[in-house]
Swiss-Prot record:
Keywords: Electron transport, FAD, Flavoprotein, Ion transport, Membrane, NADP, Oxidoreductase, Transmembrane, Transmembrane helix, Transport. Belongs to the ferric reductase (FRE) family. AIM14 subfamily. GO terms for cellular component: plasma membrane. It is a multi-pass membrane protein. The keyword Transmembrane applies. Residues 481-505 have a biased composition (Polar residues). Residues 250-388 form the FAD-binding FR-type domain. This is Probable metalloreductase AIM14. It comes from Saccharomyces cerevisiae (strain RM11-1a). InterPro entries: FAD-bd_8, Fe3_Rdtase_TM_dom, Fe_red_NAD-bd_6, FNR_nucleotide-bd, RBOH/FRE. One of its GO terms (molecular function) is ferric-chelate reductase activity. It is found in: Membrane. Residues 101-219 form the Ferric oxidoreductase domain.
Length: 570
């Protein structure tokens, strides 16, 4: 009798095929631990610079509390990469690590989607989505690069292997071809996200960003082996669904009640909206997001919405916006340009808009309740953030010192805000004291007429999806260097002037034209008062162009004062 031949069964997959499943779960657990740690940091952490600690220690504490991308991403990826290289040989089993890169990029997406929820109910009390803007920007780039490297390294591996056909591996195998398509889409997204490209056409970047993200989430489970359908695809689709629901449930239609604009003098405009569009209470300095399209319009989902800081308080009869609309017009044709320029966005009375939602400012709760020594510094359209804060603290009897400094380029901007105060009957005389004041610094000539050559050409707001306010190139030109005495003398022969131009608020508002501006001298009384009160009672707010924010931040670090800022640029 003949013996049967020995049959050997060969495993379909090598022993390394499932090597990365546990690593994906590990990344998910680290993401959860990071979220819990972030919630605890914001709930019990200290952002206040200690007067007894070193400047370096205070800086690290502030950056940690402020969700600085370098600090937080460093901590996150340190934890994620600890077990990345483990057990398998990098030379003989390199495929394990190439696949691990792909799983890492997909496993990090739930955390990124969660942190960009608006509103984020888990972190709502101590965070606002604007706190995560810088983190989200860099986190998204890293995830994208990791995913792209996964594809590039596999192509290189197959190309240099004589025993493998690149065409057969990359094109003829459906799973790998889907991955190749994902890599092309990701590469296109990275090109569109480069600074000059993004600024040149932000709308294109925004559309590509959203479509590629959705494609990455839905196509990767087709490409991935072993699969990532559970729990990663389920989590990602759930979070995407919540994003969509938030843009539907909280949205409502609105129309402009009134618009005060004089484009021949300034691009700063005052827009009035119905009070009913917002809840009975919202924090001073909150903002709204507006889309020119209705929810049923595909462009509502494809194009970015526009953020505007609310210049009014909750007790006012209307919702007021003080914004800058952009123009590329020649003198005499400002309105026509605003209507025709595809790179500008303006609010028009005859149109219906969609209010997506309102959002709180990135201001700690203890600031509103405990602040008694307050300084507010703003530039240009940053007045929309500064003015409601000033009014809030002005109405508090326990405030010992309050000063707002507004830096602008021409007098017409001040006229518009003054008209807004008069129209709304906002006078401060009844509660006026020597320790409460507004100082307006004008770098241009003190006249009621604005030179048309001061109206600069603008590009689409690169941060319209991410940032507050109506920051544009005009505010960016509002550099601190425009307010030094040397620059003032060189502009023309206009002497330095200082006076109070209004009867209603004459003792409160002081307008200074062609004055040199030194932050330390303007805040001398504020700094003296800070030494007399508890540290959590002294706060400095800043809003405007980068040069102003940097100056304010440095001042607070040097003097160890609580600092809150709203950025009008990336």
């Amino acid at each position: 009798m003949k013996e049967s031949p020995l049959i050997t069964l060969v495993k379909r997959h090598s022993e390394t095929h499932f090597a990365n499943i546990k690593y994906g779960y590990y990344v998910l657990i680290i993401s959860l631990v990071y979220l819990i740690g972030l919630a605890l940091l914001r709930a019990f952490g200290r952002r206040t610079p200690s007067r007894s600690s070193s400047a370096f220690k205070n800086k690290i504490i502030y950056r940690l509390y402020d969700i600085d991308p370098a600090i937080h991403l460093g901590i996150l990826f340190f934890a994620v990469l600890i077990p990345f290289y483990y057990h398998y040989s990098l030379t003989t089993q390199s495929t394990v690590y190439l696949k691990r890169l792909g799983r890492l990029s997909y496993a990090l997406i739930p955390l990124n989607l969660f942190l960009t929820l608006r509103p984020n109910w888990f972190l709502r009390k101590n965070c606002t989505y604007t706190d995560f803007i810088p983190f989200h920007k860099w986190f998204s780039r890293i995830i994208t690069v990791i995913g792209l490297l996964h594809g590039i390294f596999f192509i290189i591996k197959w190309a240099i292997d004589d025993n493998v056909s690149l065409k057969q591996k990359l094109i003829l195998k459906t799973f790998n071809f889907v991955g190749f398509i994902i890599s092309i889409l990701v590469l296109f997204l990275l090109i569109c996200s480069i600074g000059p490209m993004r600024r040149y056409n932000y709308r294109l970047f925004y559309i590509v960003h959203n479509l590629v993200n959705v494609a990455f989430i839905l196509l990767t489970p087709i490409h991935s082996r072993p699969g990532v359908k559970f729990p990663f695809l389920l989590l990602n689709c759930t979070l995407l669904f919540i994003h969509i629901i938030n843009r539907i449930v909280f949205a409502k239609s609105l129309m402009i009640l009134n618009k005060n604009a004089n484009y021949s003098k300034t691009n700063l405009v005052h827009v009035r909206l119905p009070r009913a569009i917002l809840p009975d209470y919202f924090e001073p300095g909150s903002h709204i997001r507006i889309s020119p399209y209705r929810r049923i319009n595909p462009l509502y989902w494809l194009l970015p919405s526009h953020p505007y800081t609310i210049a009014s308080l909750a007790e006012d009869n209307s919702i007021d916006l003080i914004i800058k609309e952009t123009s590329t017009a020649e003198p005499g044709s400002q309105i026509e340009s605003l209507r025709s320029n595809p790179k500008s966005f303006h609010l028009d009375q005859e149109k219906t808009y969609t209010l997506i939602n309102s959002y709180p400012p990135s201001v700690p709760e203890e600031c509103y309740s405990q602040g008694t020594n307050i300084a507010i510094i703003c530039g240009g359209s940053g007045i929309s953030f500064a003015l409601p804060l000033f009014r809030h603290f002005f109405n508090k009897e326990n405030v010992k010192y309050l000063k707002m400094i507004w830096l602008i380029k021409n007098y017409s901007e001040y006229e518009l805000v003054l008209d807004y105060l008069k129209t709304n009957g906002l006078t401060f005389e009844k509660k006026l004291s020597n320790n409460k004041r507004i100082s307006v610094f004008i770098s241009g000539e003190y006249t009621a007429e604005t030179r048309l050559d001061e109206i600069t050409t603008n590009i689409d707001d690169e941060n319209s999806e991410y940032e507050m306010g109506s920051f544009n190139n005009e505010d960016e030109d509002l550099s601190i260097s425009n307010f030094n005495s040397e620059n003032a003398d060189s502009n023309d022969n206009t002497p330095e002037t200082s006076h109070s131009p209004t009867k209603e608020n004459g003792s409160l508002i002081e307008v200074k034209s062609k004055h040199s501006f030194t932050l330390s001298s303007e805040l001398k009384s504020f700094n003296n008062e800070s030494a007399q009160v508890n540290q959590n009672e002294t706060w400095l707010f800043s809003c405007g162009p980068p040069s102003l924010l940097q100056l304010s931040k440095k001042y607070c670090n040097d003097e160890r004062i609580n600092f809150v800022c709203e950025t009008y640029g990336l």
